[in-house]
């Protein structure tokens, strides 16, 4: 059986991403309250409110440009349509979230907020290599945590980014954790 865990019993982490004592407040999709989700103004507003932890998702265009964007399609929140993975950056860069804000590059998000921690959900298999490359170029491995609903994507990110990368549990890890609590 698993014993109850309290904040006092959780050991300090050797992961810089987890250097915050207590619960971690995240600005999901940039904390989009007054600004369009996953846009630079949304992230700026969240940081301005004191959030140290941001959350975004990663998708990649047909020509390999890595975006900080939730959906795999432009349709829901932009003034354009189409599957991001099937469109070149030259087309996607014209899309405006809520008709106003451009979709940010993941690299620009990481560069704009060097003191922020960023939880990145790799939403598609094709995003993994591009995210790893962005982390390498920006030197941001120590201030991100990679999440995914795919164990294979998490494993690939660990292989590409190295042992210093913080990752969440994948579905199998969550199942093992939950199963262990019923012993």
Describe each region flagged by the PLM.
Residues 2-183:
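Phosphate-group recognition and catalysis centered on beta-loop-alpha active-site segments
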């Amino acid at each position: 059986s698993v014993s109850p865990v309290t904040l006092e019993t959780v050991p300090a982490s050797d992961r810089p991403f987890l250097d915050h004592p207590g619960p971690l407040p995240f600005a999901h999709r940039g904390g989009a309250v007054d600004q369009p989700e996953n846009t630079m103004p949304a992230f700026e507003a969240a940081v301005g409110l004191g959030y140290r932890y941001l959350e975004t998702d990663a998708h990649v265009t047909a020509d390999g440009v890595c975006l900080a964007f939730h959906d795999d399609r432009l349709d829901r929140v932009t003034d354009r349509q189409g599957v991001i993975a099937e469109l070149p950056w030259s087309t996607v860069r014209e899309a405006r979230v809520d008709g106003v804000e451009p979709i940010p590059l993941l690299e620009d998000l990481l560069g704009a907020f060097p003191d922020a921690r960023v939880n990145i959900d790799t939403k598609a298999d094709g995003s993994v290599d591009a995210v790893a490359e962005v982390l390498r170029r920006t030197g941001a491995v120590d201030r991100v945590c990679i999440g995914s609903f795919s164990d294979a994507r998490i494993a690939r990110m660990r292989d590409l980014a190295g042992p210093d990368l913080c990752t969440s549990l994948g579905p199998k890890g969550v199942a093992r954790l939950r199963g262990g609590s019923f012993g």
